């Protein structure tokens, strides 16, 4: 009977660890930022930078290598203006998404190797339209009627 119990505990610990890790969403924003501020940090980059250095700023908040990230090479004000286009349905079914009127320069960064503090990324430069989710601004956000809070899709 004892060997069966001994085999159970490591599995139980592994299950509990898995549940604990599942509670931390990869896209969770830092507590000190509004959703719009986190969007700007993660997805708005008016002047293109190499992915390895650009992702370092994002990864430092999370303390791990983010798998994939897209940077829009537009000023925040231009992305916020997209929030004034007609509403469309987001991937999650919510109706607060908006599509850009035109394609923009963007960079997609995909993790290829490394562990936190030494993350290596492959970059892909494209000109595409994008879809963002927008919400009313919170305290500390720029004063626009709606502000972008999530990059939903590149189209």
Curated annotation (Swiss-Prot):
Keyword Isomerase: no
Annotated site, Ancestral active site, chain positions: 43
Top-level taxonomic group: Eukaryota
Keywords on record: Disulfide bond, Endonuclease, Hydrolase, Nuclease, Secreted, Signal
UniProt keyword Repeat, yes or no: no
SUPFAM superfamilies: RNase A-like (SSF54076)
Residue numbers binding substrate: 66-70, 91
Subcellular localization, as worded in the UniProt entry: Secreted
Family label: Belongs to the pancreatic ribonuclease family.
Protein known as: Ribonuclease 8
Species, as recorded: Saguinus oedipus (Cotton-top tamarin)
